[in-house]
Amino acid sequence: MRAMKSLLSRRTVLGGALAVALGGGSARGRRILVATNEPWATYHVKPLLAEAARHGWRLTQLVPDYAKVTPGDPVPVATPADAPRADLLVVTGAGDWPADCVARFRRTRVAARALAYQVPVEAPRAKEIRPRLRVITASSPAEARAFGAYLGTKRRIEVVGSPQTDDLPQRVPEKDLVLVLTSVTHPDGTGSAAPGTELLLAATERLAAAGKRVLVGLHPRENRRLWEKYEISSVSSLAASARAEAAIGIPGTVFPLIAAVGTPLVGCTDPALSVPDYLRAVCSSTIADAGQAVAAIVSARLPDAATLADAVGPIGGSARRLLTEWD
């Protein structure tokens, strides 16, 4: 715990250095295209916009068409036919859409970046992407191991940290407040779903009945109506976690980031759920029965410093390191 506190205290100094480093910008603004496994879901790219802008770079997410683009979304999007000329194509996975984009942009340099967790099993189309990859990056050592297995490669993967940890919220927990972290109940054209919503709903009911204050951190693609009986956070789950005594939910990409804030986690793990081991490792415990929820939250603790560092990666300067790898 002392080691993690030291890491967290460094983020202020390193964050200041990051602002200075990015302030001067690049000699020439890079033009980056991004293709994700969730073609219309821009929430994984959005945290990179500010850092890219300070660097004088432009990020554009590739979409199959404009039908599912959210009006007012700050992330620039374009179809392959409309896309600007680019210096680099970044793929965040090896699903059909990223693989199709790699094939389409045959003369563009390609990089892979883990922006969302991937199950450590080689993707069917990874072999189409591997030969084109100039560099591969991940947030943490644990994520790098999973991402490498997913891509079917033993190449070096650069661990750069997560830009979201460059400005972690200061934790001020409120008594009896529990953050409930949802996943996606039903798959759609944008992406898949994770099992476990019924378990999480039942666990949330138990917590509310026990006198806990429930604050819901809603996944961007989750059905809001399932959770409207509770308070739904108006800020990101990462920001909301700073208020919570503990968090409970279906393990996902945000779990290590919330642990980095200092908020302990309980995982709701449906037998059908398939996630990398490191997402479970940051949990104080996992439950498969709603009746276990209250006791698990009351006793929730952070993992040891080594586990946390393995899952979170370096804190501070992550955006600078990522853009350096893309330059």
Residue ranges and their predicted role:
Residues 33-166:
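Active-site and donor-binding regions of nucleotide-sugar-utilizing enzymes
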Residues 76-79, 231-236, 282-292:
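Short acidic-hydrophobic, aromatic-tinged amphipathic segments that line or gate anion-handling sites
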Residues 93-94, 113-118, 162, 179-187, ...:
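Short loop/turn segments at strand-loop or loop-helix junctions that form parts
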Residues 220-261:
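Donor nucleotide-activated moiety binding/catalytic core segment of transferases
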Residues 254-307:
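Catalytic binding pocket for nucleotide-activated donors in carbohydrate/polymer assembly enzymes
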